[in-house]
From Swiss-Prot:
One of its GO terms (biological process) is peptide biosynthetic process. HAMAP family: EF_P. GO terms for cellular component: cytoplasm. The gene is efp. One of its GO terms (molecular function) is translation elongation factor activity. Keywords: Cytoplasm, Elongation factor, Protein biosynthesis. PROSITE patterns: EFP. It holds the Pfam family Elong-fact-P_C. This is Elongation factor P. Belongs to the elongation factor P family.
Length: 185
């Protein structure tokens, strides 16, 4: 059990049968009245966030999250298949479970899959990925103003804003946390 007074960023807990992770917290002790913990937390299954004030003595069971590195194999209409690198077991995931991560994953790429009670609920791609630009407008010669960007579609279908000197066929490094262009490879 964990008390609300012990909440920190990244702490997982179970409330009403759903697993949550603390995104932000603030211990508040007003001049008048009892202290409380203002908490912003995210549902690990649905991804929805909420803010709520808890009494510091409120207790919750910890949510035990298991993580595994798995390899993305392929997608078959609505399902995305990942393989456990140790047991070679294949796990099918829905589009809701792979969310934004699939925009940055190519076949055979590794990803971190998070499980709660044996069920996968979230996919985390590597922090940096290298992707090939398949479609973008050609750069205009002489357009050297700083921070000029253009939209580029990469091989996974994601749209990344890149500097004007990046052309089709270039391989770029992308930060998957923000979706931003990092460099040309």
């Amino acid at each position: 059990m964990i008390s609300a007074g012990d909440f920190r960023k990244g702490v997982t807990f179970v409330m009403d049968g759903h697993p949550y992770v603390v995104i932000d917290f603030q211990h508040v002790k007003p001049g008048k009245g009892a202290a409380f913990v203002r908490t912003k937390y995210k549902n690990l299954k649905t991804g929805s966030t909420r803010e709520e004030a808890f009494n510091p003595s409120d207790k919750f069971p910890r949510a035990h999250i298991e993580t595994k590195e798995m390899q993305y194999l392929y997608n078959d209409s609505d399902l995305y298949y990942f393989m456990d690198n140790e047991t070679y077991e294949q796990v099918p995931l829905t589009l809701v479970e792979v969310e934004d991560a699939i925009k940055y994953l190519k076949e055979n790429d590794s990803a971190i899959i998070k499980f709660y009670e044996g069920r996968p609920f979230q996919v985390e791609p590597p922090i940096f990925v290298e992707l090939k630009v398949i479609e973008t407008e050609p750069g205009v010669k002489g357009d050297t103003a700083t921070n000029v960007t253009k939209a580029a579609t990469v091989e996974t279908g994601a749209i990344v804003y890149v500097p004007v000197f990046v052309n089709e066929g270039n391989i770029i490094k992308v930060d998957t946390r923000t979706g931003e262009y990092m460099s040309r490879v």
